[in-house]
């Protein structure tokens, strides 16, 4: 499923050889993607990977996969709520490229899964096929942008942090299971921000010094802090002033309000 696909797509890209995808479980959205998330020298990185010439997904196989794997695929898709909100807010603040066509494709995948949750859980063949189709669509969305922006936001960043094991030990959880946790953490925080905006108590301030101390304590002991700083240079937050962010709060509010309620996602 996901891990084997990522490794295969990465090797295919490195050696410039064709790649055919045969997913045996509807567990992640990386089957048709052109990027792969790999742990490299202690760091989690999105690396170039080969997109498949063909995807052969047999319902008789992936539809009978362990339900835990299927649930992980559902969670990977539901995480797009956060990814798309992140992208829209970033575009609002920094004029980052934002493609409505890609967003519509990813939203279509989201709706396809959301509207068939009970049927997917029951293992109904048609619903399981829709889940697989949604996962492939999400991979195509990444192909269209050339990166993982439409499919990966704060919810995946949390997963990558956990995968690096700088704050925690090894987690015996599937990628999609960790995405579900990351989605809930991000959603709860977003709703807190929306509530503060609504009550006019939302204050924007910088945590640069506190962030530096945290990064040193968390990543310094792993010996990857310098590499992480180099990977993330220049500092993108330097493009956004606290005044600019404060002024944008009224426009950010409806983006957050469009996210599902925390109780619905639970």
Language-model region placement:
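Short, electropositive, low-hydrophobicity segments enriched in small/polar residues
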Residues: 4-6, 27, 34, 180
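Short, well-ordered alpha-helical packing segments
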Residues: 9-12, 75-78, 180, 184
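N-terminal small/polar loop signature for handling phosphorylated ligands or for N-terminal nucleophile
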Residues: 1-20, 119-131
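Generic hydrophobic alpha-helical membrane-span motif
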Residues: 8, 29, 64, 161-162
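A glycine/threonine-rich phosphate-anchoring loop and its flanking beta-alpha core
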Residues: 13-112
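Active-site segments that bind and position negatively charged phosphate/pyrophosphate groups
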Residues: 105-265
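Glycine-centered flexibility sites
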Residues: 1-2, 30, 73-75, 139, ...
């Amino acid at each position: 499923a996901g891990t084997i696909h990522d490794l295969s797509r990465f090797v295919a890209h490195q050696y410039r050889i064709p790649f055919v995808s045969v997913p045996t479980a509807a567990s992640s959205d990386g089957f048709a993607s052109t990027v792969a998330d790999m742990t490299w020298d202690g760091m989690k990185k999105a690396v170039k990977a080969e997109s498949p010439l063909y995807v052969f997904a047999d319902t008789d196989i992936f539809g009978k996969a362990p339900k835990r794997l299927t649930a992980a695929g559902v969670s990977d898709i539901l995480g797009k709520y956060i990814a798309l909100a992140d992208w829209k807010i970033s575009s609002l603040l920094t004029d980052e490229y934002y493609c409505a066509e890609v967003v519509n494709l990813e939203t279509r995948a989201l709706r396809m899964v959301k509207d068939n949750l009970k049927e997917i859980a029951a293992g109904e063949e048609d619903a399981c096929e829709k889940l697989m189709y949604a996962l492939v669509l999400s991979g195509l969305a990444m192909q269209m942008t050339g990166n993982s922006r439409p499919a990966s936001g704060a919810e995946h960043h949390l997963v990558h942090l956990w995968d690096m094991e700088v704050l925690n030990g090894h987690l015996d959880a599937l990628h999609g299971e960790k995405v579900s946790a990351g989605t809930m953490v991000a959603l709860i925080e977003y709703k807190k921000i929306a509530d503060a905006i609504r009550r006019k108590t939302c204050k924007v301030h910088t945590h640069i010094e506190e962030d530096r101390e945290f990064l040193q304590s968390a990543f310094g002991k792993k010996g990857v802090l310098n590499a992480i700083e180099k990977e993330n240079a220049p500092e993108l937050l330097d493009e956004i002033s606290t005044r600019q962010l404060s002024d944008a709060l009224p426009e950010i509010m409806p983006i957050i309000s469009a996210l599902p309620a925390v109780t619905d996602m639970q």
